[in-house]
UniProtKB/Swiss-Prot annotation:
Intrachain disulfide bonds: none
Annotated protein name in UniProt: Translation initiation factor IF-1
HAMAP family reported for this sequence: IF_1
Cellular location(s): Cytoplasm
PANTHER family listed in its UniProt record: TRANSLATION INITIATION FACTOR IF-1, CHLOROPLASTIC
Upper taxonomic lineage: Bacteria, Pseudomonadati, Pseudomonadota, Gammaproteobacteria, Moraxellales
Assigned GO CC terms: cytosol
Stored Pfam families: eIF-1a
Chief site of localization: cytoplasm
InterPro entries documented for this protein: NA-bd_OB-fold, RNA-binding_domain_S1_IF1, S1_domain, TIF_IF1
Similarity remark: Belongs to the IF-1 family.
Its biological purpose: One of the essential components for the initiation of protein synthesis. Stabilizes the binding of IF-2 and IF-3 on the 30S subunit to which N-formylmethionyl-tRNA(fMet) subsequently binds. Helps modulate mRNA selection, yielding the 30S pre-initiation complex (PIC). Upon addition of the 50S ribosomal subunit IF-1, IF-2 and IF-3 are released leaving the mature 70S translation initiation complex.
Length: 74
């Protein structure tokens, strides 16, 4: 399990909604990843739509997947 120190944070924009609360996110550096919603966002029913600015956490072990931890103002 990754430690908190190993987490990499990126800003991005949701470009597509996929089934099972997965999203395709384009990061600020141009890469596209698949991201899921964090547990607290799911618990509080925070909705994410295409075009939303989000903050994504990734581990250095798999740079193709991430976790959405914050939804910014559109």
């Amino acid at each position: 399990m990754a430690k908190k120190d190993d987490i990499i944070e990126f800003e991005g924009e949701v470009i597509d909604t996929l089934p099972n609360t997965l999203f395709k996110v384009r990061l600020e550096n141009g890469h596209e990843i698949i991201a899921h919603i964090s547990g607290k966002m799911r618990k509080h029913y925070i909705r994410i739509l295409t075009g939303d600015k989000v903050k994504v956490e990734m581990t250095p072990y798999d740079l193709t997947k991430g976790r959405i931890t914050y939804r910014g103002k559109t």
